[in-house]
Amino acid sequence: MFKRFVFIVLSLLVLACFKSNKKSVKSDKVVIGVLANGSFYDKGYNQSVYDGVVKLKDDFGIKLITKSLRPYPIEGERLLTANEAMAEDAYDVQKNPLNLFWLAGHQFSSLSVKLSYERPDICYGIIDAFDYGDIRVPKNSLAIKFRNEEAAFLAGYIAAKMSRKEKIGFLTGPESEYLNDFKFGFKAGIFYANPKLRLVSKKAPSRFDKEKGKEMARFMYKEDKVGVIFPIAGITGLGVYDAAKELGPKYYVIGLNQDQSYIAPQNVITSVLKDIGKVIYSVSSDYIKNGVFKGGVVIDRGLKEGVIEIVKDPDVLNNRLVNEVVELENKIISGEIIVPDSEYAFDLFKSKL
């Protein structure tokens, strides 16, 4: 009897999210929260997230609650672990009467599951979730992954064709293990274009130190002799653009998440476009308009869905290279080219060429 009672209670809790959604949509008082790891004005990842939710606010009149993680360690709360501090920031957002809560970044993957079970009345979206393995995604949570390796492959191909040097650079923040899809997709694109080129991969100690990024980029350009750098390092990565601009137009950079050619017009040869805002807008607007939240699953998006792409400016790349990239895009979409997202997959990819 007791087990049956517990089952009924848990079932009601799981359904609470969907009942809450419909009620909120009818009352036209939808509240959406967003938590990001860093500034929403980073000209890249978080900016894309922010643009997506601001468009929701403009189009539907929703109430928007945004918050960036506090820099760790936190002054006055040094006994907190990084995960505890992250959870505190999430709980701070949840003090508001949220209907939908977006967590932007892989570092929120575990926390999103915890929050989903704690608050079945809120629906959660996690961007760039890591592989959950045997962990079941809660019904009130949606995990979104991107096939980053597909656009990274195209970026690697372009870098290899444009570089005046025999080395290509790849700069990440401290959590580089979560960027293997980018790294090995990029490496595969380089190899596909020119097997003789070498990838120089480096890791910055922080994602929030622009000057350190500039210093590391100068070293990679001048001492490591790389011709192109692909930075995936948050604010630190912006320092690469500063270094390239100071060194001159022959020092190339690959942008990320948005077309970043405006930052360094003479240095940016292409940008990997990852329209996170588009995905957030699509899921959120479906919920707002129809009261529908399709949780409990992991979905992935890439070239085929039009969420991942690469900038192909013929004034920078020339028409021949643009045509080659378009051909590669079609081969990836059709499945003729399977882009690797890990070291093992990369070795397999090489063996088949």
Predicted segments, located by residue:
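C-terminal motif of bacterial Sec signal peptides marking the signal peptidase cleavage site
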Residues: L15-A16
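Sec-dependent signal peptide recognition
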Residues: F2-L10
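A residue-level marker of the well-folded mature domains of exported/periplasmic proteins
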Residues: S24-L353
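Signal peptide processing junction and immediate N-terminal pro/mature segment
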Residues: K19-K22
